[in-house]
């Protein structure tokens, strides 16, 4: 049986309640929410509201209307970046960002936005003092990851969010690798815009995610169209969430997302974090005992997310990944992980690394199996 260790890309398997909810919605409740007064449409609307309320609870957002449903964190980040920034604006970002931030900012730079990139250290950590120095007067936005998808490094968002607010700078956080694994509170952390995927540590279906929009933040819509409200007007409505949610929502996926959020609430975020941290401790200890392994990122797991990167001396990471799959039936992610700047930062560009990322459904026996496979490869 395949050992899946690529949960930083998407969690697998999904909890059984998620599968059940998706199946039930597809068979019995996949009407168009907010588009009709008949019972099936109203039931679909209740499904969406339940997911929206649970998502708001996860991130400490008092008003569920400020949760905007999207297909993934990439769409959430595009909505935030293109919604806020205009020609002449200045945005500060970092060298640890995913292409979901890098590429929109490149497109915005071509439109006249000034983009300033703060380098991280070799562990992938971005010193807050360096970010503060880069945020000179006139900076419109800080856009940064909460947790690296390459090194697993957790960034000091809890310090930078309040500092940005005091300076009048908007704070956009990519929580792709932290939501569902670390506590998030947009109020306490002073986060104005938070991008969250539903399919990673939250354990929801693919095609789900949301953008949390803080009070007073005005975004230009990314999409325009039908919202089920104010249909007599050809102008996009001003109210949230309708202003930023044009078109039919993924009610089937949102049924699964709601089930995932309830599952996460039931087992407890701390329990998930402690389980994954124990697996990471085991991974780090085991890989350190293999002389040919070079590890990247934090040396301890206190501020370490679910992704762990390494290289094996004498092997291209792509070969390691291929052999783990074909000889040992183990799935990991290799290469640049859609974050080339992060690999430049840690010195692994252009080959990249082998990334292993355990999840809730992995066990210590799984990690033993993985370590034995890496040891066998290293031994030749």
Residue ranges and their predicted role:
Residues 1-380:
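Pyridoxal 5′-phosphate
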